């Protein structure tokens, strides 16, 4: 019989694979940016927010804060590398005004993380206290990111069209939320359960909306397809966050 820890590891590995796919969902956007050597109207905000989210989860999962959470560390460590690459590309092809804003936000995030790390390690001396402090921060920022798709879902209902909410991404989002919720329930972790439970719920709602409005969606023109880009959610738009929970939508930038 499989032990709970073994089952948890298997589910966590599956979650890592799914979340990694979600982290890669903005690749077409950045391929377009590289080809045109211009960020056009795209914003770095979602990627900056996802970077902060990943940093918090990496800190949460290290042994001195929350033992036995290495799979949380691995996927969010990968997320840091992926998001850092996106931001480097964005910085490379941005005008000076956007570059300065990016650097300012990055600076604030790094100062915030330094304050969190020092505050937690110096003031909390047990795993329980450290997990609680960092976990609450992870839940707060992670949950905010999951409310972003509400704008897209509202648009689907209003237009009776799922043009901006692809089925495959909605399905993967749902599976990702379910997978990480299961991971958190096997060895109960409230801080991983809450944001990923929300991810599973929002993913399910997206699938229901897709089923309701798929037939009323007009066929897209080639021009519409050319400008449709997946992007990372962290604010209004579309996103992938991981603890590994993720919610992904597609927005159009013109």
UniProtKB/Swiss-Prot annotation:
Keyword annotations from UniProtKB, A to Z: Cell membrane, Membrane, Repeat, Sugar transport, Transmembrane, Transmembrane helix, Transport
Example of a GO MF term: sugar transmembrane transporter activity
Residues on Cytoplasmic side: 31-45, 91-101, 153-165, 211-254
One Gene Ontology biological process: carbohydrate transport
Gene Ontology cellular component list: membrane; plasma membrane
Residue ranges annotated for the MtN3/slv domain, each copy included: 10-98, 133-216
Localization per Swiss-Prot or TrEMBL: Cell membrane
Intervals, Extracellular compartment: 1-9, 67-69, 123-131, 187-189
Keyword Transmembrane helix found: yes
Spans through the membrane: 10-30, 46-66, 70-90, 102-122, 132-152, 166-186, 190-210
Gene3D superfamilies: 1.20.1280.290
Family annotation (Pfam families): MtN3_slv
Primary site of residence: membrane
Membrane topology listed for this record: Multi-pass membrane protein
InterPro entries: SWEET, SWEET_rpt
Known role: Mediates both low-affinity uptake and efflux of sugar across the plasma membrane.
Family, as annotated: Belongs to the SWEET sugar transporter family.
Oligomeric and partner information: Forms homooligomers and/or heterooligomers.
Protein's UniProt name: Bidirectional sugar transporter SWEET6b
The species this protein was found in: Oryza sativa subsp. japonica (Rice)
């Amino acid at each position: 019989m499989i032990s709970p820890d073994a089952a948890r590891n298997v589910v966590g590995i599956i979650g890592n694979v799914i979340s990694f796919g979600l982290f890669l969902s903005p690749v077409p956007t950045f391929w377009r940016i590289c080809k045109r050597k211009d960020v056009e109207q795209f914003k770095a905000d979602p990627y900056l927010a996802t970077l902060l989210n990943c940093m918090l989860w990496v800190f949460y999962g290290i042994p001195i804060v929350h033992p036995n959470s290495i799979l949380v560390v691995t996927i969010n460590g990968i997320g840091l590398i992926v998001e850092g690459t996106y931001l480097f590309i964005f910085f490379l092809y941005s005008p000076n005004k956007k570059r300065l804003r990016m650097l300012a936000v990055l600076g604030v995030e790094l100062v915030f993380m330094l304050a969190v790390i020092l505050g937690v390690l110096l003031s909390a001396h047990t795993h329980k206290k450290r997990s609680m402090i960092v976990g609450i921060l992870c839940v707060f920022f992670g949950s905010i990111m999951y409310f972003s798709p509400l704008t897209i879902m509202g648009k689907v209902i209003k237009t009776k069209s799922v043009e901006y909410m692809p089925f495959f991404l909605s399905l993967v989002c749902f599976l990702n939320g379910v997978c990480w919720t299961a991971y958190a329930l096997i060895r109960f972790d409230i801080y991983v359960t809450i944001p990923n439970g929300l991810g599973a719920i929002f993913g399910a709602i997206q699938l229901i909306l897709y089923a309701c409005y798929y037939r009323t969606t007009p066929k897209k023109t080639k021009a519409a397809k050319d400008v449709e880009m997946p992007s990372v959610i962290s604010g209004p738009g579309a996103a992938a966050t991981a603890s590994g929970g993720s919610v992904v939508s597609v927005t159009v930038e013109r």
